[in-house]
Amino acid sequence: VSTIYTIGHGRHAFADFLELLQQHEIEFLVDVRSVARSRWPQFNGLVLAELLRDNGIGYEHLPETGGKTKPKPEDLAHGVDRIVEIASELRTVIMCSESQPLSQHKVPRANCHRVGMLAPMLRARGIGQIIHILPNGAPIEFDESTVPSIW
């Protein structure tokens, strides 16, 4: 495995979100929210899983990789290992709710745990390329270790 994508669902309509996934040829989505719920009903876990499956994209929720609760280190490590396992077979994106991976401050900082917590752990497991999909579909890459983070 050399590449993993990240995305935040934000306020997208499902059709727009699906278009972003298809644009990047995503085959599997790993939900890295602590709880697979959203005020946007299309992003509630069971609904999202069904919508993705109907469009040929796999889905798995790994709450132990969420940023809202502090998981046991061994649970978090197991979750990250599971992401790498899935990504070794399928083009994979990890998803949380935050649409922008970086803040808009003068000195950008991690805006979500995909950048501040998960990306460094994925890189430590040999993932060489992490591509963050922006709300407009543009891919960006950066060295997450240089970005200030609260995670």
Predicted regions and their residues:
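Residues lining hydrophobic/aromatic ligand-binding pockets adjacent to catalytic sites
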Residues: V1-W151
